[in-house]
């Protein structure tokens, strides 16, 4: 994984975290960056369901890398990511969101109340509508260094 050449997601691999939307929308984007998924796919039936629904294995940009328990390594991976996807929509504020806001320069969050309450204007937002995340990825890819720095500053407030 080359620094700033990948989008990242970290979290439990369950349908309610909207992995299907993120994978499908990423596959429909024209980004040349990779999508690195740090999650528990081992012996997870949802992994096979997602593979069947999306055909993600045909997209070489999508990289399921398993789980990372070393917190220092995980922090470094977050810092190296170009952007972080957060698709959680249930359960309130998630620790992985707080960690991402504190260490990833650009965060692309599912547009739900608690994500907006936490990140405010320090993130970009997407919905589950067709084309929403893929167009947000396009906008993110076109950002200047100054724009990225502004998001980072706002996210850390």
Where are these regions (language model features)?
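Conserved donor-binding/catalytic core segment of Leloir-type glycosyltransferases
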Residues: 1-17, 23-30, 36
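Short donor-sugar binding/catalytic loops of nucleotide-sugar-dependent glycosyltransferases
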Residues: 10-14, 41-42, 68, 91
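Nucleotide-activated donor-binding/catalytic signature segment of Leloir-type glycosyltransferases, i.e.
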Residues: 39, 48-72
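Acidic donor-binding loop of glycosyltransferase active sites
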Residues: 76-92, 105
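Short glycine/serine-rich donor-binding loops of glycosyltransferases
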Residues: 94-97
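Short hydrophobic beta-strand element within catalytic cores of glycosyltransferases
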Residues: 102-109
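Conserved acidic donor-binding segment of nucleotide-sugar-dependent glycosyltransferases
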Residues: 123-131, 139-145
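A short, well-ordered alpha-helix in the C-terminal region of glycosyltransferases
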Residues: 146-157
């Amino acid at each position: 994984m080359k620094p700033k050449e990948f989008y990242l997601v970290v979290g439990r691999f369950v349908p309610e975290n909207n992995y299907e939307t993120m994978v499908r929308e990423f596959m429909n984007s024209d980004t040349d960056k990779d999508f690195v998924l740090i999650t528990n796919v081992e012996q997870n039936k949802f992994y096979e369901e997602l593979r069947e629904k999306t055909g993600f294995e045909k997209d070489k940009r999508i990289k399921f890398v398993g789980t990372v328990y070393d917190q220092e390594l995980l922090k470094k991976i977050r810092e190296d990511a170009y952007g972080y996807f957060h698709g959680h929509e249930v359960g309130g504020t998630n620790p992985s969101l707080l960690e991402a806001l504190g260490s990833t320069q650009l965060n692309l969050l599912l547009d739900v109340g608690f994500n907006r309450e936490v990140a405010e204007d320090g993130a970009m937002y997407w919905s589950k509508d067709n084309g929403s995340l893929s167009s947000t990825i396009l906008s993110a890819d076109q950002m200047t260094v100054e724009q990225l720095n502004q998001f980072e500053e706002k996210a850390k407030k």
